[in-house]
Amino acid sequence: MAVTIVLGSQWGDEGKGKITDMLSQEATLCCRAAGGHNAGHTIVHGNVTYDFHILPSGLVSDKCINLIGAGTVVHVPSFFKELAALEAKGLKGAAARAFISDRAHVCFDLHSVVDGLEEKGLGGRKVGTTGKGIGPCYSDKASRRGVRVGEILDEEVFERKLRTLHAGYTARFGQLDYDVEEEIARFKEYRKLLVPHIVDQLAFFNKHKDSSNTLVEGANALLLDLDHGTYPFVTSSSTGLGGAVQALHLNPTSIKSIIGVVKAYTTRVGSGPFPSEQLNEAGEKLQKVGREFGVTTGRKRRCGWFDLVLLRYSQSINHYTALNLTKLDILDDFDEIKVAVAYTLPDGTRLENTIPADAEVLNKVDVEYVTLPGWKSNTMGVKKYEDLPENARKYIEYIERELGGVPVKWIGTGPARDDMICRE
């Protein structure tokens, strides 16, 4: 089994879907390792736009089998709703190629209700979650009281565990805007529908051990990782290389490439430190031209300049063998482009390749920038590297040098599926 892993290297929304879509055309197996329906990306396949949340985007290829792995949390209604939406747009037979590990955890509507209550309780210190219940679901998993997908098939165990979960949250918060018996009734129907989708993950991989090309699709991104991200303003799963290996029990020696997807500037949804954020005309321009709205929440994304400190940190943890630089065309109309190259902490310490663990300290860093000339010409739809403006090529090559020679192998030049430069 030869494995390619695609990972977000910033705060998510980097455009992982397009490279995954491209690579999935040759893949025989595509897997999600972490997260739930809080993730979101858009793929333009032909003339049709597809939104993905919990499902692997390998479903756009009719030759690709898809697995939602053990490290994920699955909101069952969203799983079926998303499948139906894909098939309604022409992806016939998608359901027959979508499988869920029996060791994944179930994200209930109950978790969404609790998510809102927990965020409300934080007041001005809100994390800025998607409100999908992901955090409470992972909390239940870590506390050993969660419900696994495989347990849905055992009606007695499932109902007992869900009622116990509900009773625990009621004891904590009081009366909830949630009816546990209604949810149990809904799952009587879901139980029958889920039977062909639920698999023993180890047996599944043994069946597909001769897969010539396995693609692992990362969700969220390294800076949202529970351990390595800007804690506590993170998601609740391991979104980096280590999380993918563990959740899908990959043999590390089978990994042939690790692709880091990075936007040509930086964005973030929700709260938390963002050193290179531009609360000015430049930030507004990036937001408007880049159409920076979250696929899952619809919220405006915060925008700022490319941050090499964050990317060096991300590279040190995920060990990218190549990069996919996305949305280069959004920078076409800037006279000059800034790149963050170092931070200075309040105590005077200068950082170039790591970030402080304390989010409060990261919020207070002074950012050092270099200024590069813009190219002031259209790169939309460019397919060959040599056809890019000279200053655009210099921008890309500067990033490569500053990252120690990690090659930028793919460059996104527009929203369409084929708006991509592939460098050999």
Curated annotation (Swiss-Prot):
Subunit structure: Homodimer.
Organism of origin: Emericella nidulans (strain FGSC A4 / ATCC 38163 / CBS 112.46 / NRRL 194 / M139) (Aspergillus nidulans)
Annotated function: Plays an important role in the de novo pathway and in the salvage pathway of purine nucleotide biosynthesis. Catalyzes the first committed step in the biosynthesis of AMP from IMP.
CDD domains: AdSS (cd03108)
Reaction(s) catalysed (UniProt annotation): IMP + L-aspartate + GTP = N(6)-(1,2-dicarboxyethyl)-AMP + GDP + phosphate + 2 H(+)
Binding-site positions, GTP: 12-18, 40-42, 301, 327-329, 412-414
Protein name: Adenylosuccinate synthetase
Cell compartments where the protein resides: Cytoplasm
EC primary class: ligase
Cellular compartments per GO CC: cytoplasm
Keywords carried by this UniProt record: Cytoplasm, GTP-binding, Ligase, Magnesium, Metal-binding, Nucleotide-binding, Purine biosynthesis
Primary localisation category: cytoplasm
GO MF, one example: magnesium ion binding
Binding locations of Mg(2+): 13, 40
